[in-house]
């Protein structure tokens, strides 16, 4: 039986590819997709969800737009990474359908309420929508199997020296998620920076030759340009968000540890840092499964295999 999931995202090139991977995988049943502000403004990320589902001919999936700003802060976007549209590069179709006439939190709550079994929430942007759901619907916590997030890092940040972008945008929301008591799986930079797509991988995807694999290759062409900056020391482009979906499909590709994680919301230099108690120094019980390594080739092979679904 397929695993029911709710996808909350802020497309974003890697979010878009996470959607492609999820919808090519019969092991997953995508119940709804909600958008969050982050990689671009809330209007643009919502439009990008609709554009991707139009491309994939999955306009049957309910979509709703989420919070327009973080819980307690002004919005920061990553237009320097993802371009003016949030999905610069390929020519994507205009949406052929409209979002639901409700908020992201309302759609999430409705989906959880109507599900016969607990639902896995996959969140690949800032955690604002998920935190609002948890705060406003405590009665639905038992309907959430786990929350799989792309965010954070045990070591170096990518937006500040200490913080990864998604957590930095709304650290208060991320702290609510980690301390919710619901199982959390964290795909942080420690693993996503190892999930790099090289130029030859992009050409492999392009050679698959269907319309979706071509779009994915063109998304990666654009995404790679930002990551060519020598400061990163990358061979390719880290495909952050699809690690969440890949873990659900093939957890054996990943090395994980069980640890306590907290989020710094006040630090002068460390705001948005995920503090991972790797050496059990706090006495706190683990609240997260933290990904620390990935079989890069296995990850690339999985994506290539699933892109053939769209032939």
Curated annotation (Swiss-Prot):
GO-annotated cellular components: cytosol
EC number: 3.2.-.-
Active-site residue list: 240
Keywords noted in UniProt: Glycosidase, Hydrolase
A GO molecular function held by the record: purine nucleosidase activity
PROSITE patterns per the UniProt record, alphabetical: IUNH (PS01247)
Biological process (GO), any one: pyrimidine nucleobase metabolic process
Cross-referenced Pfam families: IU_nuc_hydro
Keyword tRNA-binding annotated: no
Residues in the signal sequence: none
Similarity comment text for this entry: Belongs to the IUNH family. RihA subfamily.
Functional summary from the UniProt entry: Hydrolyzes with equal efficiency cytidine or uridine to ribose and cytosine or uracil, respectively.
HAMAP family: Pyrim_hydro_RihA
Protein name: Pyrimidine-specific ribonucleoside hydrolase RihA
Organism whose genome encodes this protein: Escherichia coli O157:H7
